[in-house]
Amino acid sequence: ALDAALAAPGIDPRDRGLATELVYGWLRLRGRLEYIVSRLLKNPDAVPVAVGRVLTLAAYEILYCAKVPAYASVDWAVTAVRKRAGKGMAGMANAVLRRIAAAPDAYADPDFYRRDRCEDLEFLSRYYSCPPWIAAMWLRDCGRDEAVAHLAAQTEPPPLGLRVNAARAGALALFDALTGLPQIRLAQFPTLALPAGTDLSPAGVELQDALAEGLLSRQSAAAQVVLARLGMRDWPEPVFDACAGRGGKTLALAEAGKKVFAADMHAGRLSGLGRETARLGLPAIAAFRASATRMALGRAPGTILLDAPCSGLGVLSRRPDAKWRRRPEDLAGLIRLQRAMLEAAYAALAPGGRLVYVTCTVNPAENEQAVDRLGSRHRELVLEAEVPAAPDAALGEAFYGAVLKKP
């Protein structure tokens, strides 16, 4: 919805950038902002939801948007509250936001969120702006240090991930040129991770031209790295990407020289694959609509890549709305779906084939335990490689992956 609204003609690029930062930043830090505002209100429960949203959005702008003067944030927010809830609420909004603007450093101090002698879980939930059930699950499954690393990662925008097209002449030269950019977070051919918000047209390296010419693509660096760590160049061919989505991993495989074909339950997601293969100068990739729970393939592929639907808890920095939409009760249905997909993939493989299971979540029940459950039902399966969903400061996101061989 945001992308569609911002695609309208006539919007100043600066306004488009600010709107994007406000929406994503607010979603990442909503819990922290709501706690700040609640501490400054006499009766938080009496404040209408719409007014609370205005207050927390303005608080984000005051605290985290250095280029916007605090008085401007206070002004538009008070005007918005007056229109929605009258003069009384507007006066309250003015007082609250001026207090925030007067002492912004106070809200950067973790001790502010430890008030009321709260338990550690409540502090972590407040400070890292994460629903308690997610924080509790990570504390239980990962230990405090790793849980805190995951919590911290989801409060920051993810790095800009780029993939150099290894199938094109000049790929190594372009990669070498890009590694000279400042503040590179990761450079592992063909993958680069740059700081979020990196200008794509710096002097000397015309990234926009490289994108247009098919020498370069945007793709999560963490999504690329998990495939590399799982040894994708050694996977038997052809590779069937059974949950291809928009085809990011499909195209990465094709650029690496793999024979690949793709499917997804939602045909619309695959609609841009033809344009992308043309931009990248790749041979056409067969793609069709199909459910990964029923793989009716004419011939068994060498490898089935199952990038399974999951809770997405490893990519909350990129999809911060997910943490507010997800509920603990969602997990059981996802685990059942993953089990059905794994069984279908196992059945579709010929002896000697590989099943590659990938998720973008931090939840052992969807990751290691899903693989263990499949292995307990098919004891002949061999686990050849496994990548845990561990925090990685350079990548800012966490993916799990496993390679299973069917003897």
Please report, for each region that a protein language model flagged, where it lies by residue:
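Glycine-rich S-adenosyl-L-methionine
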Residues: 136, 265-274, 322-349
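Conserved SAM-binding loop of SAM-dependent methyltransferases across substrates and taxa
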Residues: 246-257
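C-terminal catalytic and target-recognition region of SAM-dependent MTase-like enzymes
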Residues: 209, 213, 219, 290-305, ...
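Conserved class I S-adenosyl-L-methionine
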Residues: 235-243
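Class I SAM-dependent methyltransferase "Motif I" SAM/SAH-binding loop
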Residues: 243-247, 310
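Class I Rossmann-like S-adenosyl-L-methionine
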Residues: 1-207
